[in-house]
């Protein structure tokens, strides 16, 4: 590991990682539903390309895949700022490939990606039916793996359930480590909600326990929806000029 780190110290990053700085391991709430995925993500962030490559994380939307992808990148950059890391959605990847074809810069795009230390690609299912983009990704994937660099992929389905993506890519996804993320159990969802309230920055806001429990029971299957309901409550509290929210609000 030390030799790996030293070999990177001389390199100067020349790219924007496109990471969300607020998505870290420190503010990722861990429970039984996501513990294995979080442990694997933390491991590859500190030892990229060493053993578990690619890492494939899957779940329904809104359960933390994007957060973990960014946490990997942020932790890796914190450990070694010279690492070349890129977070990108598969939709944006497709757009980049299309643009490179139009501008005759596919060689530059290929060189750019193959030299990354860590590629974090979100929602790989949207490569469905994109022949040229899939071809480019296949070759980039092979180069990164062969260079002992790290790829982390997320999807709304496990590899075997992906439709419209070439079998050779599916086979490579399955060659690494895969973990699913389940909807959070009640305690984890409530802890996530409490963290979201803390992040609002309004220390005077009081939301009673029965309101929190009601929100969790109705929206725990989708953390984004849970967060959306919290923001709605926060907005309404501002409109009503109150910092106290109970079931009568």
Regions found by a protein language model. Name each.
Residues 19-55, 74:
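Pre-Walker A (pre-P-loop) alpha-helix and adjacent loop at the N terminus of AAA/AAA+ ATPase modules
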Residues 49-70:
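Walker A/P-loop nucleotide-binding motif
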Residues 98-102, 159-175:
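Short regulatory helix/loop adjacent to the ATP-binding pocket of P-loop NTPases
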Residues 87-88, 120-122, 150-156:
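Structural recognition of the conserved hydrophobic beta-strand(s) that form the central parallel beta-sheet
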Residues 128-129, 134-157, 167-172:
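Conserved catalytic/switch belt of AAA+ P-loop NTPases
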Residues 163, 176-189:
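Conserved AAA+ ATPase "SRH/arginine-finger" region at the nucleotide-binding site
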Residues 194-198, 210-217, 224-239:
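C-terminal helical "lid" of AAA+/P-loop NTPase domains
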Residues 77, 81-118, 128-131:
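Short glycine-rich substrate-engagement loop in P-loop NTPases that contacts/grips substrate
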